[in-house]
Every structure is written in structure tokens, then in C-alpha cells.
Amino acid sequence: MTNIRKTHPLTKIINNSFIDLPAPSNISAWWNFGSLLGICLILQILTGLFLAMHYSSDTTTAFSSVTHICRDVNYGWIIRYMHANGASMFFICLFMHVGRGLYYGSYMFPETWNIGIILLLAVMATAFMGYVLPWGQMSFWGATVITNLLSAIPYIGTNLVEWIWGGFSVDKATLTRFFAFHFILPFIVSALAAVHLLFLHETGSNNPSGIPSDSDKIPFHPYYTIKDILGALLLILTLMVLVLFSPDLLGDPDNYTPANPLNTPPHIKPEWYFLFAYAILRSIPNKLGGVLALAFSILILAVVPLLHTSKQRSMMFRPLSQCLFWLLVADLLTLTWIGGQPVEHPFITIGQLASILYFTILLVFMPVISIIENNLLKW
């Protein structure tokens, strides 16, 4: 009798995705982040669900309801901090996952890559709306500043912003709809993640060498299941150390002050994982220009496959491209630092230079260096 695992319509899908899936024999720890993102998503949905049971999406009670969760609900504090810091872990894994894709040429699977970009945008939207829900000072002013950027769109801008707000300022209607969207989006992300996997399993995984691995495949279970479990344990350990020892390390103190439309905080800034994009936005003195640069800072990922000029897929055997990649990482860290600094003399210039460098590396240096490396192969 054939194993039910391989014949039953439901278990067959799981079997073909996580058990008998043929996987390259040489994929490194950089391939762990996909499963870690899945764990992050499940964790966020579960903790978020329990938070939603006690949260009130009304401007008069939102801040108090979050305080109530932390003080009065059984283990509410740990659920709240796991959710807040879980978002940070989610983005760390996301950035590593995208970085891996750029380094090893995984963007050569166009469907998987493009759905990945849509996933990134959806998770960013979810995180932004989640940050508004506690209704602290940074929640309110962050929502005001970021939604206001849409007013830079010619002709329809102002109407669009007022439509999103549900009034003439960020108020009760805005908070209620943000809660509704924040609740539904993770489930849309889950569906997109399933499609992401579906397209990945059409082609099979890439591997560090960038060379087709059809001649040397191993079953996913037990080799990569045990590897993923190790990754998951490290992820949960890191998260719990953050939650239990310094839960407010990555947060903003201003968010412990209830939202006040009459008092603007001295430095309005988003959560740390948006600072690189925020720095790019601020580095352009023109409003529409800044908004376009902000959008393109993420959408540029869609252009990367079109600019792949190298004869090799991966950067494993391309030292010049490797140097450029790590320069890009350093540049993004610089932008993250600048995004959290006030708009003053040295920081403005550093931010502008870092923004120019970011786009130049991806649009100019990468393709040019790849062509140079192709010519070096002839020597």
C-alpha cells in the first residue's frame, strides 16, 4: 500500500513542499530565512490575535487599552512586547532574505522575485499601520507625516489623503480603518507567501554557486527540516532575549506619551526598519521628488533582474561584485543611522550622498562591474 502521505490530497501538498521536496545539497544558512519569515508571520498573527481581543480602536481609549493589556491582562505585557519586537525580527529576516536574493542571483526567478517584492511592500504597509494603533505621539505624527506624502501626487493628492484619513486630519476614522487593515493584511500576506512558495517550487531553489543543481538533490526532510528547526530556535532565543531583557530598546520613548494633535514631537521618525527609506525621502528637498525616491528605493528591486549583465548568476566567484554588495550594505546601514538623526548640517549632506550612492550602486556600478568581470574571464 502506498504511503497515505503521498496519496491523500491534503498531505500530498505538504509532502511535496516540506518532506519529499528535492533540494540542492549545498544551500547554506542564508536559505534559512524563508522558513524563519514563515515562523515570524505565524507568531505575529497569533500574538496579534490575542492583542486584538483586548484592544479598542477608538481615539479616546486606544492608548488606555494598550496600557490595560500591559498592566492588567494575564501575560499581556509579554504578548505585546513579543508582537512589537517580533516585527523587528520579521524585518531583520526580510532584509537578510532580500540580501541573500541579491547576492546569489535568486532574482533570476522572476515570478518568485516579483511576488517577494509585493510581499515586502505588504509587510511594510502592515507594520506602518500597526505602529499607529497604540495612539502615542509617534503613532499619531508618524501617521500624519507618512499619509501626507500622498498629497504630493499631482491633481488628486489632497483628495486622496482626505479619503484615506476619512476626514480633514488623522482622527477616529483613520485609527479604526488602520486597525481593520492591520488585521486583514497579515492573512493576505499568508496567501501571497503560499503563492511565493508555489512559484519557487516550479523552478526549485537556487544555491550558493548559482549553478543548476538538478544532478545533486537531497530530500528536504530530514536534512533541511532539522536545519530549519535550529534556525527557528535561534530566532526565538534572540526574540525572547530582546523581549525579556530590553523590550523598549527598538521603540521610541515618545510613544509612551498619548497622542496630542496640538503638540508636535521635536523629531518625527518611523520605526528603525523604515529609517533607510525615510533618510532617502528626506534627502531630496522637493516633496514629490522625495516621495518618488522613497517609492523607487523599494521598487528598484524589480529592476535588478533587468540589469543583470554577468555571465554568472551568483556573486560567489565575483570578488568585485562582492565588494560592491558589501558597500551597498554599509550604505544602507549609514542611511538607517541618518534617518534617525535630526535634519542638521553634517547629517543632511551624508544622507544625500548615501542616497545617491544607493541608487548608483544598483543602477550603474553593479551592471558595469559585471561587464568588467565578464571580460576578466577571457584573460
From Swiss-Prot:
Q: Which CDD domains match?
A: cytochrome_b_C, Cytochrome_b_N
Regarding protein family, the annotation reads:
Belongs to the cytochrome b family.
Subunit organization: The cytochrome bc1 complex contains 11 subunits: 3 respiratory subunits (MT-CYB, CYC1 and UQCRFS1), 2 core proteins (UQCRC1 and UQCRC2) and 6 low-molecular weight proteins (UQCRH/QCR6, UQCRB/QCR7, UQCRQ/QCR8, UQCR10/QCR9, UQCR11/QCR10 and a cleavage product of UQCRFS1). This cytochrome bc1 complex then forms a dimer.
Q: Please report the name of this protein according to its UniProt entry.
A: Cytochrome b
Role summary: Component of the ubiquinol-cytochrome c reductase complex (complex III or cytochrome b-c1 complex) that is part of the mitochondrial respiratory chain. The b-c1 complex mediates electron transfer from ubiquinol to cytochrome c. Contributes to the generation of a proton gradient across the mitochondrial membrane that is then used for ATP synthesis.
Main localisation: mitochondrion
Membrane topology classification: Multi-pass membrane protein
Q: Tell me which residues bind heme b b562.
A: H83, H182
Provide the gene name from the record: MT-CYB
Annotated binding of a ubiquinone, by residue: H201
Q: Which processes are annotated in GO (biological process)?
A: mitochondrial electron transport, ubiquinol to cytochrome c
In terms of InterPro entries, this protein maps to: Cyt_b/b6_C, Cyt_b/b6_C_sf, Cyt_b/b6_N, Cytb/b6-like_sf, Cytochrome_b, Cytochrome_b_C_euk/bac, Cytochrome_b_N_euk/bac, Di-haem_cyt_TM
Q: How is the cofactor bound?
A: Binds 2 heme b groups non-covalently.
Classification via Pfam families: Cytochrom_B_C (PF00032), Cytochrome_B (PF00033)
Highest taxon of the source? Eukaryota
Q: Which UniProt keywords apply?
A: Electron transport, Heme, Iron, Membrane, Metal-binding, Mitochondrion, Mitochondrion inner membrane, Respiratory chain, Transmembrane, Transmembrane helix, Transport, Ubiquinone
The record's subcellular location field reads: Mitochondrion inner membrane
Additional note from the record: Heme 1 (or BL or b562) is low-potential and absorbs at about 562 nm, and heme 2 (or BH or b566) is high-potential and absorbs at about 566 nm.
Q: Which GO terms describe its molecular function?
A: metal ion binding; ubiquinol-cytochrome-c reductase activity
Q: What GO cellular component entries does it have?
A: mitochondrial inner membrane; respiratory chain complex III
Q: Which residues cross the membrane?
A: 33-53, 77-98, 113-133, 178-198, 226-246, 288-308, 320-340, 347-367
Co-factor(s): heme b
Q: Which residues bind heme b b566?
A: H97, H196
